[in-house]
Amino acid sequence: MRRPLCAALLAAAVLALAAGAPAAARGGAGGRSREHRDARYEIEEWEMVVGAGPAVHTFTIRCLGPRGIERVAHIANLSRLLDGYIAVHVDVARTSGLRDTMFFLPRAAVDNASAADIPDTPAVQSHPGLFGAAFSWSYLQTRHLVDYDLVPSRPLQDWYFSQARAESNAARPPPAPRVTPTPAGRVAAFDINDVLASGPEHFFVPVRADRKRRERHVADFAAVWPVSYIPAGRAVLSCERAAARLAVGLGFLSVSVTSRDLLPLEFMVAPADANVRMITAFNGGGAFPPPGPAAGPQRRAYVIGYGNSRLDSHMYLTMREVASYANEPADFRAHLTAAHREAFLMLREAAAARRGPSAGPAPNAAYHAYRVAARLGLALSALTEGALADGYVLAEELVDLDYHLKLLSRVLLGAGLGCAANGRVRARTIAQLAVPRELRPDAFIPEPAGAALESVVARGRKLRAVYAFSGPDAPLAARLLAHGVVSDLYDAFLRGELTWGPPMRHALFFAVAASAFPADAQALELARDVTRKCTAMCTAGHATAAALDLEEVYAHVGGGAGGDAGFELLDAFSPCMASFRLDLLEEAHVLDVLSAVPARAALDAWLEAQPAAAAPNLSAAALGMLGRGGLFGPAHAAALAPELFAAPCGGWGAGAAVAIVPVAPNASYVITRAHPRRGLTYTLQGIDVANPLLVTFVRGTSCVSASGAVEARRLAVPGPLDACAYCGSVFVRYLPSGAVMDIVLIADKRTEVEFSRGANSSMPVFNPRLHSGRSRAMLLFPNGTVVSVLAFAGHEAPTFSPAYVWASVGGALVAGTTIYAIAKMLCSSVPLARGYSSVPVF
């Protein structure tokens, strides 16, 4: 291997020293050391044998190194020796008649050496390594270094596959031009406080590539010789069962996906003229590039995986499609949009599979996982290329890339690779923003008086930057800002003024993300209140509408209906995805969604062209995406309601949970279909026996189990100036069928006043006249008391169809006429007694 480093120069000095010594007699078996000592350097010379067995070509390499190393410097021990030594292999031309030589140099001897300035080094360069010589291919055939099942071996067309048909560039919107920053925004370094205070569009960072710094990429599958490149970015997404690694450099990209459950895949992009070499026994010898399509005008893509057109057609098609991404325009936002599209389809497959949190990935979701990982790598590469070409990167671009990378990485790990909630995401982009532990007060804009909803969008953009550059332990200032965003959305929801457009959905997601995984008691209380309000906004009606929204997105994104330009996962985000409602997959909700499909003309027309089972399957998958398996998993629930999982008796133990309602510190209500093991349980009366409802109050780590009765008494009506008697209580509306319709928090005095007004309330959720006459309601107090709300407890009014009424009236008239005729006939057939008058006397 020819290395442009000082180690090669030192090795040349050692070679000159060895060349000046008397030549030793050649011969003898490999491993028999031949000493040639030097008083100054204590150098040993020996021969290393490569290959073994009569059927394998055996050859020797002349080695020079410190005294004593010859006893362990065998070919099988090279990887262990590299920790303490630098191995330099000098590969000379076969025609020169000179032998190859390997030098072992102690790393301590070159600690202070600087890299040699060798001009005209390619940005991407392959290093064939010790076994690059032609005679070593027979050794590789022993499968000592590579498992050839990772790549197709024959026939040739499975190795050099053609590109998949990519979307026409004419169908894509042209990339938006990069904003030219003003000189005033040029800073050498800034942190997130500056971005929050003045906006990310006002800052940019000058960037350049350090061409003296190089790294060597070693493929996970040991199928490609190490590639030297100039690094510019890196990301690692990993958990205990899978990992995705992204390495970005000047003109270079590598994306590898490894998993205990899925087939491996590595996607590489290099300049079209780069000489990337494969380690393989294909055709018995020679240097071949990795599998992939023909080179494009500027770059070439390689895909290393398992599968061909006969063994695994789905994997083969995935490899072809991933390879086609390399020739698309270098627009990082376009790649991110495509990644969101694939991530949505991946979430849909995972929701349809209904697997547990540690059951592994859904089979059909894996093919989308490869595509998402490739798109993330290309987005990081595209931004890097554009920034280096222009000499700067905008803070807005860094925020965009980092928040998309973090969001899509979590989805990729959970839904695509089957990871539990403890997955890790580590990234290093071309420029980083420092993240201080505390945010300055001036980082937040004041809320305009009387314009809370308008400021929600602006505050949501600030929380987006917090999400991009903060870890799971967001600063307290960010949590307070997030709590205010959710509170304003909740107030608008209670007034019936909230419209769920994309800006509101994005703001809600970033607020929930900033509140998740609290680190102390104050943060926990803020997070529980955020979740209570998300649960309240997830009414049965909203869940139905949100499921229909997801079905329409699937019809556009996955069904070929078009219209998915600029799509993001957060465009379909719903408060149900961050709520404690766990009943959205029940049959009643699925039927509600199916019955509401005709109201969406485009969706109804698309489903008409699908098989009969498509509608119920799509509805069930959409409701599954709304549940806890989407963007926030079971770990989120465990962090916000620890009292349900921390008891020594083994948790609360209820089956078929409907909802969790935190009401006080270390206390929660759990609505279930079955009797739990602990807590104070209320069984609601008048509910369908096949779909019962039980309300259990669970406090702390208590394992006591008891039963209580729902109180049916008239609630006091507090005056507008009285203390808030019902603040912190939760209003629950349900039906005799067992369906829970609303779970609403009474958070302040104004909400309490509207609740007390009953049928005169201006808040639709509290007005019984605006709901079915069959509705029932109860109030859950923070102290564990459950009271029936009498305003919703009136007798059920019978309803009759007009035809039934007219038929009943006609029947009554006929019956009355018949009875009258019979009575008259009976009266005429019975003789009547006649009276006699006195006889006159004549």
UniProtKB/Swiss-Prot annotation:
InterPro entries: Herpes_gH, Herpes_glycoH_C, Herpes_glycoH_C_sf. GO terms for cellular component: host cell endosome membrane; host cell plasma membrane; membrane; viral envelope; virion membrane. It is a single-pass type I membrane protein. Pfam families: Herpes_glycoH_C. Keywords: Fusion of virus membrane with host cell membrane, Fusion of virus membrane with host membrane, Glycoprotein, Host cell membrane, Host endosome, Host membrane, Membrane, Sialic acid, Signal, Transmembrane, Transmembrane helix, Viral envelope protein, Viral penetration into host cytoplasm, Virion, Virus entry into host cell. The keyword Signal applies. The chain crosses the membrane at residues 803-823. Residues 824-842 are intravirion. Residues 1-20 form the signal peptide. GO terms for biological process: fusion of virus membrane with host plasma membrane; symbiont entry into host cell. It comes from the Viruses. It is found in: Virion membrane; Host cell membrane; Host endosome membrane. Interacts with glycoprotein L (gL); this interaction is necessary for the correct processing and cell surface expression of gH. The heterodimer gH/gL seems to interact with gB trimers during fusion. The heterodimer glycoprotein H-glycoprotein L is required for the fusion of viral and plasma membranes leading to virus entry into the host cell. Following initial binding to host receptor, membrane fusion is mediated by the fusion machinery composed of gB and the heterodimer gH/gL. May also be involved in the fusion between the virion envelope and the outer nuclear membrane during virion morphogenesis. Belongs to the herpesviridae glycoprotein H family. This is Envelope glycoprotein H. It comes from Bovine herpesvirus 1.1 (strain Cooper). The lineage of its organism: Viruses, Duplodnaviria, Heunggongvirae, Peploviricota, Herviviricetes. The gene is gH.
